[in-house]
């Protein structure tokens, strides 16, 4: 019986995502003051903010328990997705890429929470006075991974079998 490569071969993408995320956050923390903003395009700024919650600052205004909740959640999701990668064949590229991106992003934000107690965000898109919530490389990876999982679910849907009577 021939052994085929598993989806774990995609963990290099998690490592690249993780390193890009941490290096971009390091750059922002070292070169920006808190809330400092540099205009890049008419609809885009680099703005250093601290996020004590999750996406869209969900749970940010609580007493600090959410930090530990999100750390445990990131570990649990990353372990679960590593298990899925181990079970997947390397040929399941879309799903493996999705899992790897989510793992890299989850671990990047988790390290921020462990080290700083918050997540460093800096991509600030806006139109006129309306700003989209500020985000980071890890958030992009998690969102892309989730989108690819949805795409993969639609791509792999099978037509229901027709019953003959």
UniProtKB/Swiss-Prot annotation:
<keyword id="KW-0997">Cell inner membrane</keyword>
<feature type="transmembrane region" description="Helical">
    <location>
        <begin position="65"/>
        <end position="85"/>
    </location>
</feature>
<comment type="pathway">
    <text>Protein modification; lipoprotein biosynthesis (signal peptide cleavage).</text>
</comment>
<comment type="similarity">
    <text>Belongs to the peptidase A8 family.</text>
</comment>
<keyword id="KW-1133">Transmembrane helix</keyword>
<feature type="transmembrane region" description="Helical">
    <location>
        <begin position="100"/>
        <end position="120"/>
    </location>
</feature>
<feature type="transmembrane region" description="Helical">
    <location>
        <begin position="134"/>
        <end position="154"/>
    </location>
</feature>
<feature type="transmembrane region" description="Helical">
    <location>
        <begin position="9"/>
        <end position="29"/>
    </location>
</feature>
<keyword id="KW-0378">Hydrolase</keyword>
<dbReference type="GO" id="GO:0005886">
    <property type="term" value="C:plasma membrane"/>
</dbReference>
<feature type="active site">
    <location>
        <position position="121"/>
    </location>
</feature>
<dbReference type="GO" id="GO:0006508">
    <property type="term" value="P:proteolysis"/>
</dbReference>
<keyword id="KW-0812">Transmembrane</keyword>
<dbReference type="Pfam" id="PF01252">
    <property type="entry name" value="Peptidase_A8"/>
</dbReference>
<keyword id="KW-0645">Protease</keyword>
<feature type="active site">
    <location>
        <position position="139"/>
    </location>
</feature>
<keyword id="KW-0064">Aspartyl protease</keyword>
<dbReference type="InterPro" id="IPR001872">
    <property type="entry name" value="Peptidase_A8"/>
</dbReference>
<keyword id="KW-1003">Cell membrane</keyword>
<comment type="function">
    <text>This protein specifically catalyzes the removal of signal peptides from prolipoproteins.</text>
</comment>
<keyword id="KW-0472">Membrane</keyword>
<protein>
    <recommendedName>
        <fullName>Lipoprotein signal peptidase</fullName>
        <ecNumber>3.4.23.36</ecNumber>
    </recommendedName>
</protein>
<dbReference type="GO" id="GO:0004190">
    <property type="term" value="F:aspartic-type endopeptidase activity"/>
</dbReference>
């Amino acid at each position: 019986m021939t052994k085929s490569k598993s989806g774990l071969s995609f963990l290099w993408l998690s490592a690249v995502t993780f390193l890009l995320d941490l290096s971009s956050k390091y750059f922002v923390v070292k070169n920006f003051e808190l809330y400092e903003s540099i205009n890049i395009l008419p609809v885009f700024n680099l703005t250093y903010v601290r996020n004590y919650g999750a996406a869209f600052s969900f749970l940010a205004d609580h007493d600090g328990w959410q930090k530990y909740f999100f750390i445990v959640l990131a570990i649990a999701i990353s372990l679960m997705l590593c298990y899925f990668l181990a079970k997947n064949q390397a040929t399941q590229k879309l799903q493996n890429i999705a899992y790897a991106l989510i793992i890299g992003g989850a671990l990047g934000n988790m390290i921020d929470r462990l080290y700083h107690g918050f997540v460093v965000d800096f991509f600030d898109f806006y139109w006129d006075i309306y700003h989209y919530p500020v985000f980071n490389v890890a958030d992009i990876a998690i969102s892309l991974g989730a989108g690819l999982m949805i795409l993969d679910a639609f791509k792999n849907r099978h037509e229901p079998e027709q019953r003959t009577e």
